[in-house]
Amino acid sequence: MKKAFTGILASLLLVTTLAGCGTEQAAPQNTASGDTGTKNEAKKGGKLTLYSPNAAEVNNPIIKEFQDRTGIEVQLISGGTGDLLKRVQAEAVSPQGDVFWAGGADSLEAYKKFFEPYKTKENDNLLPEYVDKNGVWTPFAALPMVIMYNKELVKAGEEPKSWNDLLDPKWKGKIAYADPAKSGSSYTQLVTMLTAFGKDDKGWDFVKNFVKNLDGKVLSGSGLVYKGVADKEFAIGITLEEAALRYVEGGAKVGIVYPSEGTSAVPDGAAIIKGAPNMEQAKQFIDFLVGKDVQSLIQKEFKRRSVRKDAEPIQGIVQTKDIKLVNYDFDFAASKKDDNIKHFSKIITGAE
């Protein structure tokens, strides 16, 4: 079953998801015959609408396999985390989506009143440090935040080693960073930096100096960060570990740094939209995401850290226990998200 799952990746990665806020598409269908690992699994059918900020290369193989195994037709709507969460909020009276998949769990928590609590059948197999005690969201993968740099633009030995190094004047205008109002991962990065220097005036003083070094360049989406660094548009960028590792694995001349002050490894998650039109199919999809097959796939193919207890360590990368982490305040990140975004926006616009 696993062999069949991973074997379809090469062809699937040729399928491009139409990216952008509110872009809608029918997920790819499989018309090939043969064993897709569904012989012992009943096909219940039905439909499912997903809202997802994930990259196409992550979405496509997982959605396709879910369709093959269940017979459920998936409609994918892609966009940035912030825009899609606002869409869920706007549709609250008459929900159009079923599952919100990915985006930092702290961002999902901030919108928890729009999600339906669900305890996955795989709950006992998940690492407890990543599980939401209230069951509003289900963890998908643990995502350390890193500094990514281009080896052709950054001389050996001059790589930033810390968050504080990002304030060096030599990096002014050369840092790729996404707008935390639009990107869930960027918001997590903002809170990580605040935590490293103090969630009070000291932390915000650091953020003000960091923004000065951005020199007015704030990107509209997280995907533009790692792409911008790899394409030599920026010397360095703040991004997800798994995104940077995909470029490293692909042979790009980039490197990654785990900041010396500590970073975060907040999971991204999936949540069922309250009042979802296809509730049973939504539950099936949540269970599927944290099942052993999908969790093995994301480790092997995407270098994402599994949230399962029985997951094997990913070879060739720093082990989780060896990454210095800040004491990330999840409740602060979720409950103060609107305030933190407004504060950051004032700094960006020069109002503060």
Question: Residue spans of the language-model regions?
Answer:
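Extracellular/periplasmic bilobal clamshell ligand-binding domains
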Residues: 316-352
